[in-house]
Amino acid sequence: MRKKILIALGILFAAGVAFAAFLSYAFSPTPDFRRNETVDGVRMDAVVAWDERKPIIRTFREKDYRALTENQLATMRDTVDGGIEGDIPCIKLNKGPKMFFQFEKAEKPVKPEKISIKILAHAWGDDDPEKTRIITDVLKDEGDLGFSYTTKRYSRQYEKYFLEYLQAEVHYTVDGENYISTFGTFQGNGDDGTSFFENEELPAPVEPE
């Protein structure tokens, strides 16, 4: 009988440890080693100005990305938008809204032969009738520093403090192969420490820039 009790206690202890580990993982920021997954040795690094947090980047061959099912796309998008609040960077619209990009293959810097960006801008509130806007554009070549892109407000603004979510897709070609690297970032006009609970409704909505 005593042996059975000890076995039961051991099982309960192991289950408790496993559950605690699961909670710790589920409510922790995405670890660095999972923030940038590559393919064919091709890697894109992205930096959001004024924010030291690294985005969560997933890189695909273009043909593989196009072949993803809706469920696979949903899982990928859920990954790049972060595991917990504060897990991904936020572009500061009132402080120089820039993103910077560099590329490498086999751990050596490379310059893509072709490059463009596609942004899916998701309105934060329910008021905006257009929930998602799609923006396609070119990136600025910064020479040896890579490429940059300046964002702007893409959704309709109803309150003093504004926030929206962007899923960026960078389309580029390296050694004749087409790739897509995608990541998520927020962007808003609030300074550090801004409380959105103290927001104020604007007299009239402000249209996207």
Give a label for each model feature.
Residues 30, 103, 175-209:
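Short beta-strand elements
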Residues 1-16:
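N-terminal Sec-pathway targeting helices
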Residues 91-109, 138-163:
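Short, solvent-exposed, Trp/other aromatic-anchored flexible loops in extracytoplasmic proteins
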Residues 159-175:
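Short, aromatic- and glycine-rich surface loops/edge beta-strands on solvent-exposed regions
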